[in-house]
Swiss-Prot record:
One Gene Ontology term of the molecular function aspect: ATP binding
Known catalytic reactions: tRNA(Arg) + L-arginine + ATP = L-arginyl-tRNA(Arg) + AMP + diphosphate
Enzyme class: ligase
Domain of life: Bacteria
Key word DNA-binding present: no
Family matches, as PROSITE patterns: AA_TRNA_LIGASE_I
The keyword Metal-binding is assigned to this record: no
Compartment list: Cytoplasm
Protein name as catalogued: Arginine--tRNA ligase
SUPFAM superfamilies given in the database record: Anticodon-binding domain of a subclass of class I aminoacyl-tRNA synthetases, Arginyl-tRNA synthetase (ArgRS), N-terminal 'additional' domain, Nucleotidylyl transferase
Keywords: Aminoacyl-tRNA synthetase, ATP-binding, Cytoplasm, Ligase, Nucleotide-binding, Protein biosynthesis
C-alpha cells in the first residue's frame, strides 16, 4: 500500500518532468535516520537522461515538497531520496486495514490469468520425504499468494504411475508378501526396501492369505501394481491432509498413454520433422534447439521414456488453457529444464508458458546433530515422522521461511520450542497478545470503538508498526515475483517484532486514558488482522491463547 502510493507519486513527477517511465525500487532503508522509505529512482534516471543523479533527486524533491503525505524528504549520498512519512498517511494505513479486514493486501495483478502450479509430484512408490514436504509448502504458499493477487490458480500433483518403477514396486511388494509367507524372495535390483512395503504385505496376507504365494504372472503383477499404488497413494493423501495441503487435480501419467495424448504428441513432433529413428528407438532433435545431446522418446522395446510422457503432459496443460505453468522441482532435476524448453519450442508453445522453480535439499538437525536415518523407512525420514514430532504449524512455517534456492537445515528442537526464539511461536504469540489486550480492555471497562481516535497515534513505535502494516502488499508481490515464500515469513517476523516493541514499551489499555487506549487498540486490531491473514496464506493457525 505505502510503496504503491510513493511509487505512483514519484512516477507522476518524472513523467511530467522528463516524459519518462522507468522501473525503480521503493524500500525500507537500513537505518531509521534514513527515513521510512527510500528510492533509487534518481540513479536509475541518471543513466537514461545522462544527468547528475543528485540534480534529478533535487527536482523530484522540489515537486513533492508540499505533499502532505511527507513530513520531509531528504537526499542522501549519490542521489537516494529518503521519505519521512506523515502521521496522517500512516494513520490512513490503519484505517484501510480496519475497513478492508481480510480483503487487505488483495490486488488484481493477475487479472484472472489462468496459471497452474504443479508440485509434490513423485513416483507413488513410497511415503513423502521431508524434501517433498518443503516442495509442498513452497507450492501451497505460492498458490495462495497468486490467488490473492488476482490469478486463477490450479494446484496439481502429477502421479508417475506408468513405467518401470511401478513394475519394480510391484515386484518388491510381492517379494515382501512371499517373505511373510515363509518363501525366500529377493527384492529386485533397484527395488524398494522400505518398511512401509512390509506393512502393506502384512495387510495382504490378512486379506488374501497365500493366494499368490510363489506365483508370478501378468495377472499377479497387475494385482500387486494396483494394490501398491492404491495403498501408497491413499497414505500420501493422508499425509497431505495431516500437513494441511490439498490439490485441485491429481493427474495420472498412465492416463496420457491410455487417452492417446502421448501418440498425438509424438505424431505432431514427427510432422514437424524434429524426431528421427536410430538403433530401433525414436529420438527428439534436442540439439536443433539447444547445445545438448538428442534424447530418446521411445525405447527400442516400444516403451515411452519419462521425457516423452512429460512432453505430452505439458502439451496437455497448454491445451487445457493455462497461460503459464510453474513446476516446482528439486534442484537435482535442473538438467531436465533445457530439454523440456526445447520440446515446448518444438511444439510451438510460447516461451514463457513453461516455468520451473527449483528448491534445494533439506537436512534435519536434532540436539545439534544431523539426523541421518529414519526408524520407519530405513533410508529416509518421512514427512509423517516430522509432522508427528513438531506438528503442522511449525513444519509449514519452517519450510516456508528459507529461500528455496538455499539448502535448508531444519532444526527440530527449535521448531518444538515454546519460546520467543522459535520463529513461528514468536509470530503466533504476537497474535495471542493482541487477543489478550481486548480481553483485558473488557475487564478494565475500557470501551472499544473501531476506527476512532487514530489521530492520537504517532510515537516512534506506533509509526514503525503502522509503516510495517503498509508493507504487506509489497511482501506479497515479492513472494510472487521472486517465487520466495520466505519473503512473507520475513515480513511477518518484522511485523511481529514491531508489535512486541510497541507492546513492551507502552501501556495499551489504560482506564485513565480511554481515548489513547482506544487508538492503540485499533492499531493492535489492525496488526492482528494482517498477522492472521499472513499466517493463513502459509497455512498456519493464529491462536488466540498461548
Amino acid at each position: 500500500m505505502l510503496v504503491n502510493a510513493i511509487r505512483q507519486k514519484v512516477s507522476e513527477v518524472i513523467s511530467k518532468a522528463y516524459g519518462s517511465e522507468i522501473e525503480f525500487e521503493v524500500e525500507i532503508p537500513p537505518r531509521k535516520e534514513f527515513g521510512d522509505l527510500s528510492t533509487n529512482v534518481a540513479m536509475k534516471l541518471a543513466k537514461t537522461l545522462k544527468k547528475n543523479p543528485r540534480e534529478i533527486a533535487q527536482e523530484i524533491v522540489k515537486s513533492l515538497d508540499e505533499d502532505p503525505s511527507f513530513d520531509r524528504i531528504e537526499i542522501m549520498g549519490p542521489g537516494f531520496i529518503n521519505f519521512f512519512l506523515s502521521n496522517e498517511l500512516l494513520r490512513g494505513v490503519v484505517k484501510t486495514v480496519l475497513e478492508k479486514k481480510d480483503e487487505y493486501g488483495r490486488e488484481n495483478v493477475g487479472n484472472g490469468m489462468k496459471v497452474q502450479f504443479e508440485y509434490g509430484s513423485a513416483n507413488p512408490t513410497g511415503p513423502f520425504t521431508v524434501g517433498h514436504g518443503r516442495q509442498i509448502i513452497i507450492g501451497d504458499v505460492l498458490s495462495e499468494v497468486y490467488k490473492e493477487l488476482g490469478y486463477d490458480v490450479t494446484r496439481e500433483m502429477y502421479i508417475n504411475d506408468a513405467g518401470k518403477q511401478i513394475r519394480l514396486l510391484a515386484q518388491s511388494l510381492w517379494a515382501r508378501y512371499n517373505q511373510l509367507l515363509g518363501v525366500e524372495k529377493e527384492i529386485p535390483e533397484g527395488g524398494y526396501r522400505g518398511e512401509y512395503l512390509v506393512d502393506i504385505a502384512r495387510d495382504l496376507v490378512n486379506e488374501i492369505g497365500d493366494r499368490y504365494k510363489d506365483l508370478w504372472n501378468e495377472e499377479v503383477e497387475e494385482f500387486f501394481k494396483q494394490t501398491a499404488l492404491n495403498r501408497i497413494l491413499s497414505s500420501m493423501k493422508d499425509t497431505l491432509e495431516k500437513i494441511g495441503s490439498s490439490f485441485d487435480v491429481y493427474f495420472s501419467e498412465k492416463s496420457l498413454i491410455e487417452d492417446g495424448t502421448v501418440e498425438e504428441v509424438l505424431k505432431l513432433l514427427k510432422n514437424k520433422d524434429v524426431v528421427y529413428e536410430k538403433d530401433g528407438a525414436v529420438w527428439l532433435k534436442v540439439s536443433a534447439f539447444i547445445d545438448e545431446e538428442d534424447k530418446v522418446l521411445v525405447r527400442s522395446d516400444g516403451t515411452y521414456t519419462y521425457f516423452m510422457t512429460d512432453i505430452a503432459y505439458h502439451y496437455k496443460k497448454y491445451k487445457r488453457g493455462f497461460r503459464k505453468v510453474y513446476d516446482i522441482w528439486g534442484s537435482d532435476h535442473h538438467g531436465h529444464i533445457p530439454r523440456m524448453k526445447a520440446a515446448m519450442k518444438a511444439l510451438d508453445i510460447p516461451d514463457d508458458f513453461f516455468n520451473v522453480i527449483l528448491h534445494q535439499f533439506v537436512t534435519l538437525k536434532r540436539g545439534g546433530e544431523i539426523v541421518r536415518m529414519s526408524t520407519r523407512a530405513g533410508e529416509f525420514v518421512t514427512l509423517d515422522e516430522l509432522l508427528d514430532e513438531v506438528g503442522r504449524d511449525a513444519t509449514r512455517y519452517f519450510f516456508a521461511m528459507v529461500d528455496p534456492n538455499t539448502h535448508m537445515v531444519f532444526d527440530i528442537d527449535l521448531a518444538k520450542a515454546k519460546s520467543m526464539d522459535n520463529p513461528v511461536y514468536y509470530v503466533q504469540y504476537a497474535h495471542a497478545r493482541i487477543h489478550n489486550l481486548f480481553s483485558n480492555a473488557e475487564k478494565k471497562g475500557v470501551k472499544f470503538e473501531e476506527g476512532k481516535h487514530l489521530e492520537l497515534l504517532g510515537n516512534e513505535e506506533e509509526r514503525v508498526l503502522m509503516r510495517n502494516l503498509g508493507m504487506f502488499n509489497t511482501a506479497l508481490k515479492e513472494v510472487a515475483q521472486m517465487f520466495a515464500p520466505n519473503r512473507l515469513t520475513n515480513y511477518l517476523q518484522s511485523l511481529a517484532e514491531s508489535f512486541h516493541a510497541f507492546y513492551t514499551k507502552h501501556v495499551i489499555v489504560d482506564p485513565e486514558n480511554p481515548e489513547l487506549s482506544n487508538a492503540r487498540l485499533n492499531l493492535a486490531l489492525a496488526t492482528g488482522i494482517v498477522l492472521r491473514k499472513g499466517l493463513k496464506l502459509i497455512g498456519v493457525s493464529a491462536p488466540e491463547r498461548m
